[in-house]
Each structure stands twice: as C-alpha cells, then as structure tokens.
Swiss-Prot record:
Keyword Protein biosynthesis: yes
Protein name from the UniProt record: Glutamyl-tRNA(Gln) amidotransferase subunit C
Sorted UniProt keywords: ATP-binding, Ligase, Nucleotide-binding, Protein biosynthesis
Name of the top EC class for this enzyme: ligase
Organism: Aquifex aeolicus (strain VF5)
Any GO BP annotation: translation
Catalytic activity: L-glutamyl-tRNA(Gln) + L-glutamine + ATP + H2O = L-glutaminyl-tRNA(Gln) + L-glutamate + ADP + phosphate + H(+); L-aspartyl-tRNA(Asn) + L-glutamine + ATP + H2O = L-asparaginyl-tRNA(Asn) + L-glutamate + ADP + phosphate + 2 H(+)
EC number: 6.3.5.-
Molecular function, one GO term: ATP binding
SUPFAM superfamilies from the UniProt entry: Glu-tRNAGln amidotransferase C subunit
Superkingdom in the source lineage: Bacteria
Length: 94
C-alpha cells in the first residue's frame, strides 16, 4: 500500500497541491497501479518475441519557411509580461 508521505512526496516533486481527500484517492490509485505492475511482472513472456517496428525512412514534411509571430501577437494573451517578455512563476529554487 502506498502511504500518505509517499503521495505527498510525489505531489511535491510534481509541484501539485493536493486537498486532503485527493491524497486518499491518489493513495488508492497509485497502489492499484503498482499492484497491476506486479501482476504484469508475473506473466510468462519467455516464448514471446519482442515487438520491434522499424521504418526504412522516417516520414518528414518539407521544410518550408513561414513568417513567425511578431512579438505583440505572441504576447497578446500572456497573463503577465514585462519589457516584451513573458513573466512566469519561478520553478527553480535558489
């Protein structure tokens, strides 16, 4: 069973704020996922050939130049901007 502290640690790494009732829900869901993985580990795959799909050539589109957005259009729907740049929350702790 996945414990509460483990769920909180995963949430912190993912930068998620969980409500109390969500913690319990995620405990159950993560536990179920890990149980399912354990079931998959028990499968006998000894005589199953690996599935490999190879392509001779990766399909790619033609590289055609297109005009890019001008700065004002790019920033038009930005919730916050400063000096012509997007302002975003800090995600790296110093």
């Amino acid at each position: 069973m996945v414990d509460r502290e483990w769920v909180l640690k995963i949430a912190k790494l993912a930068r998620l704020e969980l409500k109390e009732e969500e913690i319990e829900v995620f405990q159950k869901q993560l536990s179920d996922i890990l149980d399912f993985i354990d079931q998959l580990k028990e499968l006998d795959t000894e005589n199953v050939e690996p599935y490999i799909q190879e392509f001779e050539e990766t399909p790619m589109r033609e590289d055609e130049p297109h005009p890019s957005l001008d700065r004002e259009k790019a920033l038009m729907n930005a919730p916050e901007r400063k000096d012509g740049f997007f302002v975003v929350p800090r995600v790296v702790e110093v």
